[in-house]
């Protein structure tokens, strides 16, 4: 690891400084905080005294030879999120004197992991919490896991004949599947299946809303949205169901306005439109019993409580209040019975419970490469840079003049560009070009050393911070473990899980293990804004520098891919005890290289045998000894059994 000047450490750095730097008091939502040791603490029930030191936990897990990168999943946080959601709706129902109940479902697509779904069903059983499925595979999962006869199984997605028949027959098992009509051609398939099976389903209908949504998923609504029926199609569906004597099975209205809705006004508009559609369906003769408000309940990734894409300008209680109040108002005006309210709030349930931990393998610091020394022979173009550097050094003893500093920095950039042109034309050597780059970095370092942070962000000087920034090499694959950062520029809270009694004197970003330029983490939360560099510590010799990515429990594992053949990480499910000890409930082991290769139809045995044959040729040609061949095969066989990530 790179050495650093200990004199630059701020001995007065406090935990409060770290809290302010990383904003954990805002986005942590009382689940995550910094303790007196300078480590991240996990408090699964927010205001309770039950807490655990995350850094200590990770080290104890590693002592079991379970290596990073790894996902820690805190069951108690998952339980708390389900409880909070149900309590919020219970409070809203009581406040507004609503004459029915809330009955949530979890959309399996958010996190299909068996252990997660089992815990959601266990923790939600008191409220008859159900599941939402969007494919035949998810339908089979839902049917196998849901045992509570009152829990709902909302059947969304494209539906062929088999999907519909399975859902209809599942009613005879005592299940509560509701087939939601999302495409107009599903109506005739349902009618045909009912005739063939002589059994009736519970039906719902998904409406395309005209209300405008916002944010990254704003196109989930409107006439061109992927799913749902237009108003004319809804009218046609009602007509066809009446003709087939199935109108009495139409009991649910569903709508969806996108994921992670940041602005509560968008939700209110959609609720008003959907509530009126619900009323009209009742007037058309359908015995409407449920209204499914879909997903969209957002979480506050940056802690600013604003309508930015990384936040929400409403609380969970605000959301529940608006859902309940709006539906009630529409029903009472039209003398319609209050329906059971369903939500498909996946991200809000599972995001907080998962923390991705990775270690830093090494760093690259531009400042460590600055070794400016006088060279005997220098071209005029290099001398210009030397003069600029000397002028900046002389400013140390002069009154700070921002305009002069800006002028000198612009000169340095111009002279560096001149050197590049000269190198391309063959007028200067590779060594001289290296010297020019070192001089430019030295100029940036001089400016940074005697300007405070407020002036360094002047538009003409802001790139200096980027110039002097560090790259931290992360032992993970962005594409496997946190793909939304690459695919949709999603921002997650990222923070060291220890050393918060020390000032993070570096600014840097992360490069992952893949051979892909997109494999970087370079967008970070900054008090409602997005910054490209994160405050970080210099890694220490022989000590792991551990980083946590928080609120990453939704979608990431399902969407991750095997880019460069990096596989699944270790996943550990944790229960925290009342005495602040913990219990490891489940360990889901990472993929070995052999397992990853077999997913792509490579046989590990055949691979080893192929290499062994090559070693025999090499032995015969005397380019490889028998001992070297044995060592090579042993290394390969051992490697195939081990993780795809780097380890000691």
UniProtKB/Swiss-Prot annotation:
GO terms for molecular function: arginine decarboxylase activity; metal ion binding. Signal peptide: none annotated. CDD domains: PLPDE_III_ADC (cd06830). It catalyses: L-arginine + H(+) = agmatine + CO2. Substrate binds at residues 291-301. One of its GO terms (biological process) is spermidine biosynthetic process. Its cofactor is Mg(2+); pyridoxal 5'-phosphate. Belongs to the Orn/Lys/Arg decarboxylase class-II family. SpeA subfamily. Catalyzes the biosynthesis of agmatine from arginine. This is Biosynthetic arginine decarboxylase. It comes from Prochlorococcus marinus (strain MIT 9515). The lineage of its organism: Bacteria, Bacillati, Cyanobacteriota, Cyanophyceae, Synechococcales.
């Amino acid at each position: 690891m790179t050495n650093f000047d200990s004199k630059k450490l701020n001995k007065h750095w406090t935990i409060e400084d770290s809290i302010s730097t990383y904003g954990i008091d805002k986005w942590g939502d009382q689940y995550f905080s910094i303790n007196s040791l300078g480590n991240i603490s996990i408090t699964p029930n927010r205001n309770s005294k039950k807490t655990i030191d995350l850094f200590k936990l990770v080290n104890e897990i590693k002592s079991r030879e379970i290596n990073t990168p790894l996902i820690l999943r805190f069951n108690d946080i998952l339980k708390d999120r389900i409880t909070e959601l149900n309590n919020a709706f219970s409070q809203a129902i009581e406040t507004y004197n609503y004459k029915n109940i809330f009955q949530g479902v979890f959309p399996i697509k958010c996190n299909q992991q068996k252990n997660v779904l089992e815990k959601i069903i266990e923790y939600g059983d008191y409220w008859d919490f159900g599941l939402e499925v969007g494919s035949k595979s998810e339908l089979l999962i839902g049917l196998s896991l849901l045992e509570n006869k009152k829990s709902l199984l909302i059947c969304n997605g494209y539906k062929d004949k088999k999907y519909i028949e399975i859902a209809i027959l599942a009613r005879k098992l005592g299940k509560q599947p509701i087939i939601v009509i999302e495409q107009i051609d599903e109506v005739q398939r349902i009618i045909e299946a009912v005739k063939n099976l002589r059994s009736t389903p519970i039906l719902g209908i998904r409406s395309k809303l005209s209300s405008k949504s916002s944010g990254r998923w704003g196109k989930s609504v409107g006439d061109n949205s992927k799913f749902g029926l237009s108003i004319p199609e809804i009218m046609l569906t009602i007509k066809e169901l009446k003709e087939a004597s199935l109108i009495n099975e139409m009991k649910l209205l569903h709508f969806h306005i996108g994921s992670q809705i940041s602005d509560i006004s968008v939700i209110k508009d959609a609720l008003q439109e959907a509530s009126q559609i619900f009323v009209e369906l009742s007037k058309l003769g359908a015995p409407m019993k449920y209204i499914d408000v879909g997903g969209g309940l957002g979480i506050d990734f940056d802690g600013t409580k604003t309508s930015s894409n990384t936040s929400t300008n409403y609380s969970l209680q605000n959301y529940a209040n608006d859902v309940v109040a709006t539906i009630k108002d529409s029903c009472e005006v039209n003398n319609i019975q209050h329906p059971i309210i369903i939500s498909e709030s996946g991200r809000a349930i599972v995001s907080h419970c998962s923390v991705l931990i990775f270690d830093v393998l090494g760093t690259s610091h531009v400042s460590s490469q600055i070794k400016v020394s006088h060279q005997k022979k220098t071209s005029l173009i290099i001398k210009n840079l030397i003069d600029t550097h000397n002028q900046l050094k002389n400013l140390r003893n002069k009154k700070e003049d921002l305009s002069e500093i800006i002028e000198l920095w612009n000169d340095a950039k111009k002279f560096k560009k001149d050197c590049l042109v000269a190198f391309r034309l063959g007028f200067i050597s590779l060594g001289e070009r290296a010297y020019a780059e070192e001089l430019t970095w030295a100029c940036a370092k001089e400016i940074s050393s005697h300007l405070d942070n407020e002036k360094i962000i002047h538009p003409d000087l802001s790139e200096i911070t980027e110039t002097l920034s560090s790259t931290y090499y992360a032992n993970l694959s962005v594409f496997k473990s946190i793909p939304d950062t690459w695919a949709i520029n999603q921002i997650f809270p990222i923070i060291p899980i220890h050393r918060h009694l020390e000032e993070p004197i570096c600014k840097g970003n992360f490069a992952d293990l893949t051979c892909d330029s997109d494999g970087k983490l370079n967008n970070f939360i900054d008090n409602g804004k997005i910054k490209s560099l994160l405050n970080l510590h210099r890694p220490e010799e022989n000590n792991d520098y551990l980083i946590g990515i928080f609120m990453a429990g939704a979608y990431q594992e399902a969407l991750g891919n095997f880019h460069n053949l990096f596989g699944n990480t270790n996943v550990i499910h944790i229960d925290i005890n009342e005495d602040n000890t913990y219990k490891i409930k489940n360990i889901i082991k990472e993929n070995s290289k052999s397992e990853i290769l077999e997913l792509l139809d490579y046989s590990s045995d055949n691979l080893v045998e192929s290499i062994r044959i090559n070693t025999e040729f090499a032995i015969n040609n005397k380019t490889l000894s028998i001992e070297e061949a044995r060592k090579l095969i042993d290394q390969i066989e051992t490697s195939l059994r081990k993780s795809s990530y780097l380890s000691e």
